[in-house]
Amino acid sequence: APRPVLVVEDEPTLATAIAQRITAEGWTARVASDGASAVQAATTLRPDLVIMDIMLPVMDGLEATKRIVAERPVPVLILTARDDEADKVIGLGAGADDYMTKPFSMRELIARCKALLRRVDRAKVIAKNSENEKLLDFGSLVIDPAQRIVTVNGKQVHLTPTEFDLLATLARKPKSVLTREKLLEEVWDWVDASGTRTVDSHVKALRHKLGSKTIRTVHGVGYAFEPPEVQD
């Protein structure tokens, strides 16, 4: 079946251009021109992917993304005019999976869309493979790969599917450094590692939710999971 893609863009020329490219890929495109109607459209369409402009009338792209993702996990690719918005988009819990800065080439947009759809399929494989996996128990922080639940001091922490898979991938090898390339390959199923900023922004999101010491940066190499210190 063709994969439904929701395009949220208030600039008609761009919206049409994106929708045409998506249709040319054999996917189904549906266009919404403001944040509020995007939230409604997501409920009826149940898209496999959302392409969302950050600057929208009625409700901005970040708020719309939060609401869409809260209702049903779906990868969101944010379109932004400023490159420095990456952390705001991904790193502060709006729930987006990736972002692109305007102007961008349609070819690059479609490549990112394909990567995110692979990420959806990858997540299903990861979930299937984790069905019988034991708890990753680090005392105050517990990760349940089978149920896909993370708790800190007994309280559940809401993570996006990508954040969860990134955390679990790091936590399976505590204190070991994993390169960005390795993480992109394991979590995103990307082989060309052009999206290192994406990994960085997701790490920021995890630190934001779980505390800054949870993931250590090894400069020029990658990241390592640091189990919480055991308190006596």
Describe the role of every protein-language-model region.
Residues G26, I110-C113, P145, V187, ...:
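Short amphipathic alpha-helical/adjacent loop interface patches that line ligand
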Residues K124, V230-D232:
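C-terminal end segment of the histidine kinase catalytic
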Residues P4, T28, P75, L135, ...:
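Residues at or immediately flanking beta-strands
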Residues R3-P4, A115-V177:
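Short, Lys/Arg-enriched segments at the junction into DNA-binding effector domains
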Residues A1-K124:
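N-terminal/domain-start alpha-helical segments
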Residues A96, I149-T214, H219-V221, P227:
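Positively charged, aromatic-enriched patches within helix-turn-helix-type DNA-binding elements
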